[in-house]
Structure formats: structure tokens, C-alpha cells
């Protein structure tokens, strides 16, 4: 009897582990390109660190960070591509994609640095549950290409400097397609629906600024070498279903 009970408990324990194993077996995306000499790494939810190379898996919960002269592109399973500049960091908070499903979702958080992303099929699926956090605001994405810059909270000479962010809507890859982002926080929200325009959140207690024409030279300069790869290279454009 005791032997049977032990076997049952062992089988139950194995069954409980199966979902975790299944999740680990299917990464959210992979590293499509890395440039620069310093390291790029991922911190998993259990705190473990691993060096990133072209082809490395990116999993839900990973915090991806770059060194002082490193840039990279992450290609996700739904066709989304994220380009990250030097000394930058973002977290894959949630990723769930299955072709034809209505509950697809993709949530990320940019912690610091510069970025550019091209949304994929999650942003075009029925639920359109794609959200990008930039510390001081959240971007609701509706099939688009965006660049931005995030400054993390810091302390200088004993004075706290709030986090801040700037985001700009870019021309969509598919000509003639409607594109927009909703930028919101607890103090207000704006809709940016014209390429070349954007908004700024100057601190942690302010609403997004009025939409205006913007160009982030810092982002353009840093990611210039990656721009062609985001649009072409080894990262194919996502196709509409």
C-alpha cells in the first residue's frame, strides 16, 4: 500500500511539473542581431543570468539588457521586432501568441535606454492586447512602429531625479495602414495617430504632454546601424493573416 501511495505521489509531482516544462520549451522570441563588443544578457525570473548571442532564446519574464556599446534586435514569435540601444533594458512581462486565437497578448516594460519596435500580429489580432510600459506611462499599441527614450529614476548629489520618457510614432511598414498609440498614466492620456509626432512625460507626476512633432536624435543616432535590419535583414516583416 505504501509503495502504491509513493508511486501515485511521484506521478502527481511529475504532472505538476509538465506545464512549467511546456512553457520553458517554447520561448517568446530570439535574438536576431547583436552589434558591439560589450555584453548583452538576460536575467530570468529565478535570478539566473545568461549571455545573449544571435539565436539565443528570449523567454517570458526575461529582463534583457545591453552593455555600453551594444545594440540588439529581438524577434518575437508573432513577428514583433524590438531594437534596443546601448545601456538599455526591457522586460518581457507577458507573451502569449497562437495563430487565430482571440486571447493573444504581449506586454513589455522598458526600464531605461533607447528603443524602437515594430508591432506584430498580436497588435493586429482581435483582442489587440499589446501594451508597452515606459515607467511613467503605458502605450496601447494598434499596429505600428514606435521609437522612444526612457530615463530611469536616479539620485544625483542627494537629489532625486524622476523617471521620464519620450515616444514618437513612426511611419508604418505597410503603406496606407492606419497606425496609432495611446499613451496614458494616472494623470491623463493622449492619442498619437500621425507619424512623426509624439509625446513626452517629463516626470512621475505629470500627464503625457500635448502631441507635437518630434524627432529623437539620440535614438536615431544610436539605432541607425540597426534600422535596415529592423526593416529587412534577418527579421522578416509580419504578414497579415
Regions found by a protein language model. Give the residues of each.
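C-terminal interaction modules
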Residues: 1-27, 49-53, 77, 85, ...
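Short N-terminal segments immediately surrounding and downstream of signal-peptide cleavage
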Residues: 25-43
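Residue-level recognition of beta-strand termini and adjacent short loop/turns
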Residues: 36, 77-78
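Generic short beta-strand segments
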Residues: 36-39, 69-72, 144-146
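A generic structural motif
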Residues: 41-43, 75, 184
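N-terminal post-signal-peptidase region of extra-cytosolic proteins
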Residues: 44-61, 65-71
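Short, small-residue-rich packing micro-motifs
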Residues: 64, 68-73, 81-132, 137, ...
Amino acid at each position: 500500500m505504501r509503495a502504491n501511495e509513493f508511486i501515485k505521489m511521484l506521478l502527481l509531482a511529475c504532472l505538476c511539473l509538465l506545464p512549467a516544462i511546456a512553457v520553458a520549451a517554447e520561448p517568446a522570441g530570439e535574438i536576431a542581431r547583436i552589434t558591439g563588443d560589450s555584453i548583452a544578457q538576460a536575467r530570468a525570473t529565478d535570478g539566473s543570468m545568461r549571455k545573449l548571442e544571435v539565436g539565443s532564446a528570449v523567454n517570458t519574464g526575461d529582463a534583457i539588457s545591453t552593455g555600453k556599446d551594444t545594440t540588439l534586435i529581438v524577434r518575437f514569435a508573432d513577428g514583433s521586432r524590438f531594437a534596443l540601444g546601448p545601456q538599455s533594458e526591457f522586460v518581457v512581462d507577458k507573451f502569449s501568441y497562437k495563430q487565430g486565437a482571440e486571447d493573444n497578448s504581449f506586454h513589455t516594460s522598458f526600464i531605461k535606454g533607447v528603443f524602437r519596435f515594430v508591432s506584430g500580429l498580436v497588435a493586429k489580432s482581435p483582442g489587440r492586447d499589446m501594451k508597452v510600459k515606459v515607467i511613467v506611462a503605458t502605450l496601447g499599441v494598434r499596429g505600428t512602429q514606435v521609437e522612444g527614450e526612457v530615463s530611469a529614476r536616479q539620485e544625483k548629489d542627494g537629489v532625486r531625479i524622476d523617471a521620464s520618457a519620450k515616444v514618437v510614432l513612426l511611419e508604418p511598414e505597410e503603406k496606407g495602414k492606419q497606425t496609432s498609440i495611446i499613451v496614458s498614466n494616472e494623470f491623463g492620456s493622449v492619442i498619437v495617430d500621425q507619424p512623426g509626432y509624439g509625446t513626452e512625460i517629463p516626470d512621475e507626476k505629470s500627464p503625457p504632454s500635448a502631441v507635437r512633432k518630434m524627432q529623437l536624435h539620440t535614438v536615431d543616432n544610436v539605432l541607425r546601424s540597426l534600422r535596415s535590419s529592423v526593416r529587412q535583414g534577418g527579421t522578416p516583416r509580419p504578414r497579415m493573416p
